[in-house]
């Protein structure tokens, strides 16, 4: 099962790996991206992959995905998506053995709290450039996107002032235009989940900052699309985050220099 981020690259990469290892493939794309998946399979067939070796199975995870992963004829699963779903898959196939007594392998790429730690020696301008690119490109819909920015207390205010200013210059709209910095999130459900998280942080008293450049052409698109403006949320501690927020939301945690050793282990345990 591939993800809705980079829906052609990840999808065909998983297929190619399985084919190279001598397997036939039942390819289920994310339910949001069936058309690009169909095009990818058509290209593979045109390139010479035998028709019986790869089958495209679009549909919802709860139906098509569940049927695939519970079928004993499926001898291996590759998955890109949430940690919760990967854990469920692991439980479903953990006790399944083939006729030779071998377990069913699961290869899963899931979420996490990607962090950047900035100390007082960092060049602020470079930090802001890198943060904007990592946190907000592709509307934050990347496994590698920055989720938590850890700022040493001595440089936090200056860095945040510059970062807020840069966010206010970003254009949000149709990603087909070269002038656009931030496009929509994948669907209405994703938008609702992100907005629910932002509202929950506001309710806890956390400082929330949202800004994009005002533009009448962009604003018309905002009303009809699943747009979430780039968002900055200041937290009291890293431990407030329990799961990855998959969108253009950056969390900020301040730290003192003598706390650095303890901070370094937080992202790895998330």
Model-derived features with residue positions:
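Conserved small-residue-rich beta-alpha loop and adjacent elements
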Residues: 1-51, 125, 257
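Short alpha-helical
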Residues: 6, 32-35, 62-63, 83-84, ...
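A structured beta-alpha segment of the ubiquitous adenosine-cofactor-binding alpha/beta core
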Residues: 55-78
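Glycine-rich nucleotide-phosphate-binding loops and adjacent flexible coil segments
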Residues: 248
């Amino acid at each position: 099962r591939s993800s809705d981020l980079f829906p052609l690259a990840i999808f065909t990469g998983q297929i190619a790996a399985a084919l190279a290892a001598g397997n036939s493939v039942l390819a289920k794309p994310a339910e949001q991206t069936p058309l690009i998946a169909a095009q990818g399979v058509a290209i593979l067939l045109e390139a010479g992959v035998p028709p019986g070796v790869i089958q495209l199975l679009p549909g919802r995870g709860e139906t098509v995905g569940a049927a695939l992963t519970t079928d004993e004829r499926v001898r291996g699963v590759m998955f890109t998506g949430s940690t919760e779903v990967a854990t469920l898959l692991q439980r479903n196939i953990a006790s399944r053995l083939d006729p030779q007594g071998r377990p069913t392998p699961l290869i899963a790429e899931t979420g996490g709290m990607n962090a950047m730690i900035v100390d007082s020696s960092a060049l602020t301008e470079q930090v802001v450039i890198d943060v904007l690119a990592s946190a907000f490109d592709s509307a934050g819909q990347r496994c590698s996107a920055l989720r938590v920015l850890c700022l040493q207390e001595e440089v936090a205010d200056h860095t945040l002032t510059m970062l807020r200013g840069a966010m206010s210059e970003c254009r949000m709209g149709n990603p087909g235009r070269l002038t656009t910095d931030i496009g929509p999130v994948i669907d209405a459900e994703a938008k609702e989940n992100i907005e629910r998280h932002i509202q929950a942080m506001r309710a806890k008293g956390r400082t929330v900052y949202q800004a994009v450049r005002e533009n009448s052409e962009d604003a018309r698109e905002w009303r009809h699309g699943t747009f979430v403006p780039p968002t900055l949320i200041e937290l009291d501690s890293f431990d407030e985050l329990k799961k990855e927020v998959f969108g253009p939301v950056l969390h900020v945690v301040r730290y003192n220099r003598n706390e650095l050793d303890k901070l370094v282990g937080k992202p790895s345990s998330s």
